[in-house]
């Protein structure tokens, strides 16, 4: 168990270095600084939310973490920030309870699906909600900045009810995982929808694997 915790800490330190020292996401700085509503859907544990708060001390941040232990760690870190809304569930194509394959060493690489990112996993039951249900339930009219890294479940979210959700998002970052040919085909359709929604769309390639990359999309004005 201590070995797992040591590896978790090592990975968290590496993520912290990427965000706060290397500023790998500085391309989004101005959008975050001007955002009133930010969605942080499981990317770099709670570190990205902290970076957003560092850049913008007034914005309201909605943070999503489905795994109980990780949620409790985020809660103990962010509890005193009343403008960070902590949600112990994930965004998906359907609301309900589902099994996540938890990568205990690198919890950020857990998913509903198994791949090289989580070759050794533990099954845990987690809650999920659709983005549309969350927006309606919390009376949110728009999202200024949405960041999503949900280990190739992004295909479900970006495909489901997109006609409703795309009109709510001003800026979008999502990590895309092309794990097989089927996903490549689906991605072509999703990418077309994104290009038809946002004025400026960029692909930011990963320095680690060519099948994983970021989509960075922005609109000029609301529809």
What does each of the following model-derived ranges do?
Residues 1-223:
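Phosphate/nucleotide-binding beta-alpha loop and adjacent structural elements of enzyme active sites
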């Amino acid at each position: 168990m201590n070995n797992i915790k040591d590896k978790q800490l090592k990975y968290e330190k590496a993520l912290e270095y990427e965000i706060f020292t290397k500023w790998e996401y500085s391309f989004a700085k101005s959008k975050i600084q001007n955002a009133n509503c930010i969605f942080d859907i499981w990317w770099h544990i709670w570190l990205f939310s902290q970076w957003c708060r560092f850049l913008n001390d007034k914005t309201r941040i909605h943070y999503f973490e489905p795994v109980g232990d990780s949620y409790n760690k985020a809660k103990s870190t962010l509890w005193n920030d009343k403008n960070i809304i902590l949600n112990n569930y994930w965004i998906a194509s359907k609301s309900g309870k589902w099994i996540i394959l938890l990568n205990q060493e690198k919890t950020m690489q857990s998913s509903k699906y198994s791949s090289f990112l989580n070759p050794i996993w533990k099954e845990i039951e987690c809650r999920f909600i659709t983005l549309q249900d969350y927006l309606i339930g919390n009376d949110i009219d728009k999202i200024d900045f949405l960041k999503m890294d949900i280990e190739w479940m992004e295909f479900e979210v970006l495909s489901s009810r997109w006609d409703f959700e795309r009109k709510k998002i001003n800026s979008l970052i999502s990590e895309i995982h092309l794990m097989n040919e089927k996903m490549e085909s689906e991605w072509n359709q999703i990418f077309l929808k994104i290009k038809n929604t946002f004025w400026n769309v960029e692909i930011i390639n990963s320095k680690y694997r060519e099948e994983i990359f970021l989509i960075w999309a922005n609109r000029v004005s609301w529809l």
